[in-house]
Amino acid sequence: MSTFFEPENGMKQNAKTERILDVALELLETEGEFGLTMRQVATQADMSLSNVQYYFKSEDLLLVAMADRYFQRCLTTMAEHPPLSAGRDQHAQLRALLRELLGHGLEISEMCRIFREYWAIATRNETVHGYLKSYYRDLAEVMAEKLAPLASSEKALAVAVSLVIPYVEGYSVTAIAMPESIDTISETLTNVVLEQLRISNS
């Protein structure tokens, strides 16, 4: 898994960088992208602007470091999930995983707000766009590792991953307005994905 952020000046993250990131993330969550400026971060962190810029030379570098705080946590959580087993109860295993992923987006509201801000920023910022592209590639690789034992072929696996990730991401945004429960959707998505994983492409 890749990470874009390395602290400036060869320094490891310390209390000051953590404070800057805490303040910046709070500003992004409460004020949105347009309320997040280096000067505002410095003010809220009780630091000088030059001190903030010592650790983060530009707003783009700060945005990427902030993204690492959240997005890498998601990758780590997913990577720690054991792969599914090709043995019995494949449906139950897959359903449990998908239910967990769908529920995660609903329960961690702060994280979801940060994600949504980054999706919006990426439409205007090439650095953030590149970061998200790398993140989703990494996420696809991790997801493929988890689903691979159930897949009949590489093609079937690739299609399944391409179904799961966009659906889960979109569900976190739209679920509150959907007419069906998360349990119903988990079951339906499990059926669709499992059928795809079992498709023979020979």
UniProtKB/Swiss-Prot annotation:
Residue ranges annotated for the HTH tetR-type domain, each copy included: 14-74
GO molecular function, one term: transcription cis-regulatory region binding
Keywords per UniProt: DNA-binding, Transcription, Transcription regulation
InterPro entries in alphabetical order: Homeodomain-like_sf (IPR009057), HTH-type_TetR-like_transc_reg (IPR050109), HTH_TetR (IPR001647), Tet_transcr_reg_TetR-rel_C_sf (IPR036271)
The keyword Transcription regulation is annotated on this UniProt entry: yes
PROSITE patterns, sorted: HTH_TETR_2
Protein name stated in the entry: Uncharacterized HTH-type transcriptional regulator in dhlA 5'region
